[in-house]
């Protein structure tokens, strides 16, 4: 039952999926943390895998960069393959001065400069929010592991290279914790099709201070976030 962008067979995906942007990161997660792994899709090199974590069937697949790419895959995964829980795992740039590099942010809501949710909501402003059950599961997992997390609004940008850096001042004033490029679209798709979605990101760099993590630091922090998220996933 291939779709235009996914060539997996029916039943290839688990109900719960980790959803990083980078397909090679999806491959890394599958090979590092899952058992009994099978690659189930590879259209346009957007790799997807299904395996088990502590006995529970889990899938992981790349979403690509930006809301349009993420929305295409999320739509087909939910609508055509029956995925019910999509957890984006990725990185973001911090805005607020009290958010530090290597912090883990849970996107309770996602502001955006994209018009996609207005298009699906008859021109009105749709509140793109995470699913409470998914969010609570990850928060509880973080508590058990002693992982420091921040919970709040993030911003999903259409442009990586913004022409208006003054917008960062507005974001900070409004309490936005970090900037990424997918969550608002993912949340909109999930609400449209009756699925559950959450965005969990690590701070890889600070837009205000210019501080960045090293490759080694990014990997260590990312691994901690993935384990925390997988531990939450097996409770769903």
Swiss-Prot record:
<dbReference type="InterPro" id="IPR018016">
    <property type="entry name" value="Nucleoside_phosphorylase_CS"/>
</dbReference>
<feature type="binding site" description="in other chain">
    <location>
        <position position="21"/>
    </location>
    <ligand>
        <name>phosphate</name>
    </ligand>
</feature>
<comment type="function">
    <text>Catalyzes the reversible phosphorolytic breakdown of the N-glycosidic bond in the beta-(deoxy)ribonucleoside molecules, with the formation of the corresponding free purine bases and pentose-1-phosphate.</text>
</comment>
<feature type="active site" description="Proton donor">
    <location>
        <position position="205"/>
    </location>
</feature>
<dbReference type="InterPro" id="IPR000845">
    <property type="entry name" value="Nucleoside_phosphorylase_d"/>
</dbReference>
<comment type="similarity">
    <text>Belongs to the PNP/UDP phosphorylase family.</text>
</comment>
<feature type="binding site">
    <location>
        <position position="44"/>
    </location>
    <ligand>
        <name>phosphate</name>
    </ligand>
</feature>
<dbReference type="GO" id="GO:0005829">
    <property type="term" value="C:cytosol"/>
</dbReference>
<feature type="site" description="Important for catalytic activity">
    <location>
        <position position="218"/>
    </location>
</feature>
<dbReference type="Pfam" id="PF01048">
    <property type="entry name" value="PNP_UDP_1"/>
</dbReference>
<dbReference type="InterPro" id="IPR004402">
    <property type="entry name" value="DeoD-type"/>
</dbReference>
<feature type="binding site" description="in other chain">
    <location>
        <begin position="88"/>
        <end position="91"/>
    </location>
    <ligand>
        <name>phosphate</name>
    </ligand>
</feature>
<feature type="binding site" description="in other chain">
    <location>
        <position position="25"/>
    </location>
    <ligand>
        <name>phosphate</name>
    </ligand>
</feature>
<feature type="binding site" description="in other chain">
    <location>
        <begin position="204"/>
        <end position="205"/>
    </location>
    <ligand>
        <name>a purine D-ribonucleoside</name>
    </ligand>
</feature>
<dbReference type="GO" id="GO:0004731">
    <property type="term" value="F:purine-nucleoside phosphorylase activity"/>
</dbReference>
<dbReference type="GO" id="GO:0006152">
    <property type="term" value="P:purine nucleoside catabolic process"/>
</dbReference>
<feature type="binding site" description="in other chain">
    <location>
        <begin position="180"/>
        <end position="182"/>
    </location>
    <ligand>
        <name>a purine D-ribonucleoside</name>
    </ligand>
</feature>
<comment type="subunit">
    <text>Homohexamer; trimer of homodimers.</text>
</comment>
<keyword id="KW-0328">Glycosyltransferase</keyword>
<protein>
    <recommendedName>
        <fullName>Purine nucleoside phosphorylase DeoD-type</fullName>
        <ecNumber>2.4.2.1</ecNumber>
    </recommendedName>
</protein>
<dbReference type="InterPro" id="IPR035994">
    <property type="entry name" value="Nucleoside_phosphorylase_sf"/>
</dbReference>
<feature type="binding site">
    <location>
        <position position="5"/>
    </location>
    <ligand>
        <name>a purine D-ribonucleoside</name>
    </ligand>
</feature>
<keyword id="KW-0808">Transferase</keyword>
């Amino acid at each position: 039952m291939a779709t235009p962008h996914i060539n997996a067979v029916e039943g290839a995906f688990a109900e719960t999926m980790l959803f990083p942007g980078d397909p090679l990161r999806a491959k890394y997660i599958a090979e590092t943390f899952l058992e009994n792994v099978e690659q189930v899709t590879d259209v346009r090199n957007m790799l997807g895998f299904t395996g088990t974590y502590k006995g529970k069937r889990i899938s992981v697949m790349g979403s690509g960069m930006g809301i349009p790419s993420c929305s295409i895959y999320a739509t087909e995964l939910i609508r055509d393959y029956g995925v019910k829980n999509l957890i984006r795992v990725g990185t973001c740039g911090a805005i607020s001065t009290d958010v530090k590099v290597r912090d883990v942010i849970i996107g309770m809501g996602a502001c955006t400069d994209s018009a996609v949710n207005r298009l699906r909501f008859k021109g009105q402003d749709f509140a793109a929010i995470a699913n409470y059950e998914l969010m609570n599961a990850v928060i509880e997992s973080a508590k058990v592991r002693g992982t420091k997390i921040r919970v709040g609004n993030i911003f999903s940008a259409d442009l990586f290279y913004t022409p208006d850096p003054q917008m960062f001042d507005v974001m900070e004033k409004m309490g936005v914790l970090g900037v990424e490029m997918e969550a608002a679209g993912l949340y909109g798709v999930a609400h449209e099709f009756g699925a559950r979605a959450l965005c969990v990101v690590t701070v890889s760099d600070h837009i205000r201070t210019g501080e960045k993590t090293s490759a080694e630091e990014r990997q260590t922090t990312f691994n901690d976030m993935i384990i925390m998220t997988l531990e939450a996933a097996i409770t769903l």
